[in-house]
Every structure is written in C-alpha cells, then in structure tokens.
C-alpha cells in the first residue's frame, strides 16, 4: 500500500463565510481515511474587511497595486492568523500524529485566467512560523498557490476540477 501521509486541508469559498479544515490519511492512491473536520466562521468584521479590499479591485493591474498596500499586508496577516487559530483547534482530531503536509488555499482576491493571473491573500511563510510551536506540526510542509500554479500550467486556476 505504501507510505501513509497525514494531510490537513484548509479551504475557503467565495461566500466568505469561513474556513473549512479537514485532516485525512492517504497513500495518494487507493487509501483515504478522514480523521476530522472543523469549520471556523469569519467574524462580520473580518468578512467586511475582505469584501472591502476585494471591492477595490476591478482589474489585474489594480490587484497588483493593492497587494503593495499596508491595508493588504495587515489583512493578509489577520487572515493568516485566523487560519492558524483554526489549525490550533483541529490538530487534536488527528490523534496527535504528525501532519506531513498542510494545504493552504488562502482567500482569492482576484482571479483572471485570461490574464494568466490570480492572487490569494494569506502568507504561507508566516503560517509556517506560527504553527511551529505545535509538536505535531513543526515538521509539516505547507503547500500553497494552487490556482497560480494551475494557471501557469495552462489551466483555469481550478486545479481540483477537470
């Protein structure tokens, strides 16, 4: 059957209601077992901040400019720490076993496949540092930029759909 990996997936949607967290074990092929799910709802304040910054972006160039702003940097940190809190809540569901990989989606601010551009807010490097204090997460690899990598490989930025 091969090595069994433990993975933690973090996912948000366009509704901006919150983040879903799931822990699975898999060998990447025929074996899959769900260990736990959790959901952390955005506060109205955080939801409004996300909607506010998204409303300022109507083009790829505007997105490229806004991600240089202090408003963006502050919101990115807040979103990253929100994810960290959700991770803190769910790590117990994994039975205390080490998490091999964390799939960090972030929140899509702008998505324009025809421009070969997409941008998700959230900082994987900061997330990695913030979870290092948890024994079963300190060696976890964080993967991110799913949409960007899909677009760069001729996809539409939806790597989980055919």
Where are the language model's segments positioned?
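Short acidic/glycine-rich loops and adjacent helix/strand connectors
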Residues: 1-162
């Amino acid at each position: 059957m091969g090595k069994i990996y433990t993975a933690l997936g973090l996912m948000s949607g366009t509704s901006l209601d919150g983040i879903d967290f799931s822990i699975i074990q898999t060998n990447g092929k025929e074996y899959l077992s769900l260990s736990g799910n959790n959901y952390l709802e955005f506060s109205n304040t955080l939801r409004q901040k996300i909607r506010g910054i998204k409303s300022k972006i109507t083009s790829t160039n505007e997105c490229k400019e806004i991600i240089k702003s202090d408003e963006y940097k502050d919101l990115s940190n807040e979103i990253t720490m929100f994810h960290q809190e959700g991770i803190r809540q769910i790590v117990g569901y994994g039975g205390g076993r080490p998490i091999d990989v964390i799939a960090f989606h972030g929140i899509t601010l702008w998505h324009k496949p025809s421009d070969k551009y997409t941008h998700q807010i959230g900082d994987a490097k900061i997330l990695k540092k913030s979870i290092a204090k948890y024994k079963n997460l300190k060696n976890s690899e964080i993967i991110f930029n799913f949409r960007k990598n899909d677009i760069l490989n001729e996809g539409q930025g939806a790597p989980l759909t055919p």
